[in-house]
């Protein structure tokens, strides 16, 4: 048992560093992505919403497919390192794009790389205990965000010197390293009990899981991408050079709050922390609807980070606990697929509302859906 504990800790550390490096590469790009798409490649907000929504939808499909296949094949590792490799490859493609439609195939490759998520999360859930599962997911997310902070700092320092395209190419390097770490150092754990895979059905799922899936889908229809907040800030008067700083504030906030919220969910329950995350996002929407000052906009990026820090790791922990043991990766992947498929219309609808009714309109829409889904969450049975 002690030997297994050592091996589990080693596996977790490798995933932590792989996640850190991957997010470092990703977040060299993310702070300047919406401005690159709208200002350099001349896309409107609906096109930006389409690209971001397409990416989120593909994340969902690839996550679900990889979760299903990893359960069926009893293999996890291959999906993880291949996913990192595809993410690195896509960034080279971004650097070569000259008009916004060129981004579409590389966005597809990039987001298909999310085949790593459900198998990785299933491994983390398996090597964790009931007492530390929330903490482990929270720490993993914290390191994601910490890597992102370093990536954003690199972006801020070198953006004016190197420009968009060279930065995009450089962003591929740390993710290639992530792929190598997993490929070389993660040992595939053999299943102790090999069962004939019969496929997952709705009968296998707890009714609380089904209800949680429905309310999460409603919330996700209003959860448009971060790009809208950055463009909102730019249109409000922030200089282009300060936009990555706002993204840094958001990411640093998410990094600081992920682990505490993960630990808090271990103590007071997942549902309470998820309700808090909905309240934080509702507050962001209210502030931006009420035509804030620049200082209040900066504050909303802190709140947005806290919302993400509370939402993302606790969602995964909650789903992993509601899911049947033998279908854990399938449920994690299926959950991500459903809420991600909702993200495609979410960002596109937000773009259309922005273009047609003004930049506050998407926040009214999202606030309404947040209230509805938050009310529904009260009817989900508590799980520790």
Label each PLM-derived region with a short phrase:
Residues 172-192, 373-381:
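C-terminal membrane-cytosol helix-exit motif in multi-pass small-molecule transporters
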Residues 50-68, 248-260:
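Central cavity-lining transmembrane alpha-helices of secondary-active solute carriers
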Residues 2-57, 209-246:
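Helix-loop boundary and gating motifs at the non-cytosolic
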Residues 106-146, 318:
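Cytoplasmic helix-loop-helix junction between adjacent transmembrane helices
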Residues 157-173, 352-369:
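A membrane-interface helix-boundary motif in multi-pass transporters
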Residues 20, 90, 101-116, 217, ...:
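Hydrophobic core of transmembrane alpha-helices in multi-pass small-molecule transporters
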Residues 78-92, 172, 272-287, 367:
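Structural signature of the two symmetry-related core transmembrane helices
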Residues 62-74, 159, 258-269, 354-355:
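Helix-to-loop junctions at the C-terminal end of transmembrane segments
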């Amino acid at each position: 048992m002690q030997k297994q504990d050592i091996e589990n800790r080693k596996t977790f550390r490798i995933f932590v560093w792989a996640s850190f490096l991957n997010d470092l590469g990703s977040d060299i790009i993310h702070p300047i992505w919406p401005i690159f798409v709208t200002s350099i490649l001349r896309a409107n907000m609906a096109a930006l919403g389409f690209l971001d929504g397409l990416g989120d939808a593909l994340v969902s499909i690839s996550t679900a497919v990889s979760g299903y296949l990893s359960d069926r094949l009893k293999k996890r590792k291959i999906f993880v390192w291949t996913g990192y490799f595809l993410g690195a490859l896509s960034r080279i493609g971004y650097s070569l794009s000259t008009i916004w439609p060129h981004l579409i195939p590389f966005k597809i490759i990039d987001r298909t790389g999310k085949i790593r998520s459900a198998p990785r999360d299933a491994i983390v859930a398996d090597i964790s205990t009931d007492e530390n599962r929330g903490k482990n997911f929270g720490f993993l997310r914290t390191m994601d965000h910490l890597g992102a902070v370093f990536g954003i700092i690199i972006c801020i320092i070198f953006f004016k010197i190197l420009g968009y395209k060279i930065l995009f190419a450089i962003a591929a390097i740390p993710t290639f390293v992530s792929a190598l770490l997993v490929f070389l150092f993660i040992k595939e754990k053999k299943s102790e009990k090999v069962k004939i895979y019969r496929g997952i059905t709705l009968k296998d799922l707890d009714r609380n899981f089904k209800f949680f899936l429905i309310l999460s889908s409603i919330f996700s229809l209003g959860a448009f991408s971060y790009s809208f907040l950055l463009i909102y800030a730019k249109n409000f008067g922030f200089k282009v050079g300060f936009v990555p700083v706002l993204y840094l504030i958001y990411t640093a906030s998410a990094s600081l709050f992920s682990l505490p919220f993960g630990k808090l969910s271990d103590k007071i329950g997942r549902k309470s922390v998820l309700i808090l995350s909905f309240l934080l996002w509702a507050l962001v929407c209210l502030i931006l609807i009420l035509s804030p000052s620049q200082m209040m906009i900066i504050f909303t990026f802190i709140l947005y980070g806290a919302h993400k820090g509370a939402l993302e790791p606790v969602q995964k922990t909650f789903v992993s606990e509601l899911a049947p043991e033998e279908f854990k990766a399938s449920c994690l992947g299926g959950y991500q697929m459903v809420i991600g498929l909702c993200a495609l219309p979410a960002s596109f609808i937000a773009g259309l509302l922005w273009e047609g009714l003004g930049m506050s309109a998407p926040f009214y829409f999202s606030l309404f859906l947040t209230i509805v889904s938050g009310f529904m969450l009260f009817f989900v049975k508590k799980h520790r």
